[in-house]
Amino acid sequence: MLHYAVVFFIIALIAAVFGFGGIAASAAGIAKILFFVFVVLAVASFLFGLIRKG
C-alpha cells in the first residue's frame, strides 16, 4: 500500500506542475482537480498501509 501512496503522490506533483505552473493553460483546471484527487488517494493509501502493518 505504501507503494501506491508514493505513486499517487508523484502523480499529484506532476498534476500540480501542470496546473499551478501555467505550462498547459488549457488543462490547468483539470490538473488542479487531479492534484487534489491524487493527494487524497495518496493520503488514504498511506493510512491504510499503516493500519495494515500496525
Swiss-Prot record:
It holds the Pfam family DUF1328. Its main location: membrane. The chain crosses the membrane at residues 5-25, 30-50. It is a multi-pass membrane protein. InterPro entries: DUF1328 (IPR009760). One of its GO terms (cellular component) is plasma membrane. It is found in: Cell membrane. Coiled coil: none annotated. Keywords: Cell membrane, Membrane, Transmembrane, Transmembrane helix. Belongs to the UPF0391 family. This is UPF0391 membrane protein Mpe_A2904. It comes from Methylibium petroleiphilum (strain ATCC BAA-1232 / LMG 22953 / PM1).
